[in-house]
Curated annotation (Swiss-Prot):
Pfam families documented for this protein: DDE_Tnp_4
Subcellular locations according to the entry: Nucleus; Cytoplasm
Quaternary organization: Interacts with NAIF1.
Known function: Transposase-derived protein that may have nuclease activity (Potential). Does not have transposase activity.
Ranges for domain DDE Tnp4: 148-300
Main location: nucleus
GO cellular component terms, A-Z: cytoplasm; nucleus
Keywords: Cytoplasm, Hydrolase, Metal-binding, Nuclease, Nucleus
Keyword Nuclease listed: yes
Enzyme Commission identifier(s): 3.1.-.-
Protein name: Putative nuclease HARBI1
GO MF, one example: nuclease activity
Gene: Harbi1
Amino acid sequence: MAIPITVLDCDLLLYGRGHRTLDRFKLDDVTDEYLMSMYGFPRQFIYYLVELLGASLSRPTQRSRAISPETQILAALGFYTSGSFQTRMGDAIGISQASMSRCVANVTEALVERASQFIHFPADEAAIQSLKDEFYGLAGMPGVIGAVDCIHVAIKAPNAEDLSYVNRKGLHSLNCLVVCDIRGALMTVETSWPGSLQDCAVLQQSSLSSQFETGMPKDSWLLGDSSFFLHTWLLTPLHIPETPAEYRYNRAHSATHSVIEKTLRTLCCRFRCLDGSKGALQYSPEKSSHIILACCVLHNISLEHGMDVWSSPVTGPIEQPPEGEDEQMESLDLEADRIRQELILTHFS
């Protein structure tokens, strides 16, 4: 069980009680529009987070100068959604950038501790069948239980000698593996892979691969793009379709797989700390991976609370390292190829 951490308000220690603090900032004193513009979430959602994370962010104390869970959560949300520790964000709640940084660290760890509660594949057969039905209704692709893709998130260089995080654009990044359902809910998130790894290598070494290699529901597949190799449990598009049925398969595959592309764009637009618009995450790879995962947890909680996650403006494709020619090669897995051809003949001929 994680030990709750009490964060002290350094501004109070420096300036005394006359300095405005978040304990004097009341959510009920500001409008919903203000909360959305500054922190990206509505009032009731913030109250829910206070209830969910409060025990991890505070403990009984005689100190009067501890920053409240509410303060810490607002500071973290402000960073996640804006991507910076800008002065106006701290001023809005009466804390310094240093205090904001500590708040972000604590809220991030509290969310990461709860990741498995909000990010997981459904366990029962009825839920699995529901996934298949929903994906099939999108473009007629049978047996799909999730769409998978990778996304690079820029981080600061760990050190001059470590090149494992340098991606094909020559920038340092984490390559994150994500699986979503048709609603955009995240069912698998792995955020710690170094940016030098190609998508197919990330998948090969992932917990997701181990999970599906050891067993999966019958006639169930993930959909991946051409950066992945074909597997018995992962359907990829045909590199060179020849027959009408193969073209129909590729069109259905593309239309269905687009849900993960849309989800990743939306995730980065909602959480600007991920999109690089304010620069790379200025943390170690481990801390950066936790921040990414925390944003993913918030994304899923938003969906559970009925928030319209698609309403964030999406400006276009996320800039990512270029794919190499080797990523367009077909797998030599003969059994996987047989399964795909059988599916094409059965459902697209």
